[in-house]
A protein has these predicted regions:
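Cysteine-nucleophile amide-bond enzymes
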Residues: 1-209
């Protein structure tokens, strides 16, 4: 576990804040490279995944016990386990040794708005239809980036399935805020565009030394 990243998240923790991470894992690097046309310098994006901070629970662990909401596809060969879709996870899941970048972003929300945001994330997480993570939609967004069609609905959009950045944006939309100011369709939301959004009033970044 990357203790530096865990400390970074713990220092800037608040329910409903947005977290971005960028890993050197080959699969995640492909996602970062696929967002190159969206970055200001044309280089690969720093980030491959986005999620929301949830609650801090006294669960007896010594790692801060921070929980997050995310949409992800997680396959564990060692545990013979597949987790697909919107889920609640512990933030240590993303405190990886191969992490190169991390960020925490926040809006100036009232306590009522912050509570409503977490409640919306909980609603999606435990929705009886079980919202899944759409691998096809990921490729649809990469296609939209290349073809300049981000403002169009994702060509592989699936009902009851959302990408990580789309999930984060939907939670904010659910409380009357949109964190993306451009014309990008919700189904094509990317971690890179979230990172560039001017709406955030709180911003802290971490970079691997």
């Amino acid at each position: 576990m990357n203790q530096q990243v865990l400390n970074f998240f713990g220092q800037h923790y608040a329910p409903g804040r947005v977290c971005l991470v960028g890993s050197a894992n080959p699969i995640y690097k492909l996602i970062r490279e696929g967002q190159s046309k969206l970055t200001k310098d044309g280089n690969p994006s720093r980030y491959n995944h986005a999620f929301l901070m949830g609650s801090r629970r006294n669960d007896g662990r010594s790692d801060g016990s921070l929980y997050i909401f995310e949409s992800d596809l997680h396959i564990s060969v060692s545990e013979w386990q597949v987790k697909n879709g919107v889920m609640e996870s512990r933030i240590t899941k993303w405190c990886l040794d191969d992490l190169e970048y991390a960020a925490v972003l926040g809006l100036n929300l009232s306590q009522q708005e912050s509570d409503a945001l977490v409640q919306k994330a909980l609603w999606y997480t435990y929705d009886e239809n079980h919202i899944r993570y759409p691998v096809g939609e990921l490729f649809g967004t990469l296609y939209a980036i290349v073809m300049g069609r981000l403002n169009k609905r994702n060509v592989f959009d699936i009902v009851d399935a959302v990408q990580c950045a789309t999930f984060v944006r939907m939670c904010f939309q659910g409380i009357g805020h949109d964190i993306i100011m451009s014309s990008t369709d919700t189904t094509n939301t990317t971690p890179e565009e979230i990172s560039q959004s001017p709406v955030f009033t709180f911003r802290q970044e971490w970079k691997k030394e």
